[in-house]
Amino acid sequence: MSAPAQNNAEVPTFKLVLVGDGGTGKTTFVKRHLTGEFEKKYIATIGVEVHPLSFYTNFGEIKFDVWDTAGQEKFGGLRDGYYINAQCAIIMFDVTSRITYKNVPNWHRDLVRVCENIPIVLCGNKVDVKERKVKAKTITFHRKKNLQYYDISAKSNYNFEKPFLWLARKLAGNPQLEFVASPALAPPEVQVDEQLMHQYQQEMDQATALPLPDEDDADL
């Protein structure tokens, strides 16, 4: 990427790669941030769109250059050029599709092969859809690999900021960091059931307290 414009020189900027199976909602998710959508750039050589997502914290502005694959993952894995120099990542799956969760270890493997020790958030998208197939008790991969996990709903903006806040705190080495202003987000296309979201959060908290199952370890 070209050097940032002079007025952005002071803003800490981090390359964030967004990975996961096709159709899990990665592009929908990144497009929610309207400024990033307006300022995105296409890098033809590797077929990605880079969305600069700015967030304002109690310690100043922070920017994530979010690399979105433009659907290449449908044709197999991504090239190393996509991952090189990534400083953080979001792995996304669809809670209505078990196979997308089953493929998470493959995405994680490809990512850490190139990037090694970077902070990673695992996101289960589409929690607004009533027919949830991937339940809290089966979501254990993040615990085995020391990742953060959030339920999200890109279309409703539910938990949109959570992955970015967690990554910002890790990258800044500051757990006190907070977002002080919300970015302009696209209006929700769907509404989430607040009660159901609360129930999902409780189920996730309970599942996290349970010992890890060991039957999957050989695969992961």
UniProtKB/Swiss-Prot annotation:
Molecular function GO labels: GTP binding; GTPase activity
Modified residues (Phosphoserine): 2
GO biological process: nucleus organization; poly(A)+ mRNA export from nucleus; protein import into nucleus; ribosomal subunit export from nucleus
Swiss-Prot/TrEMBL induction comment: GSP2 expression exhibits carbon source dependency.
Record-annotated Small GTPase Ran-type domain positions: 10-174
Cellular compartments annotated: Nucleus
Stretches for region Switch-I: 40-48
Misc note: Present with 2460 molecules/cell in log phase SD medium.
Record note on quaternary structure: Found in a nuclear export complex with RanGTP, exportin and pre-miRNA.
Family statement: Belongs to the small GTPase superfamily. Ran family.
Name of protein: GTP-binding nuclear protein GSP2/CNR2
Taxonomic lineage from the root: Eukaryota, Fungi, Dikarya, Ascomycota, Saccharomycotina
Gene: GSP2
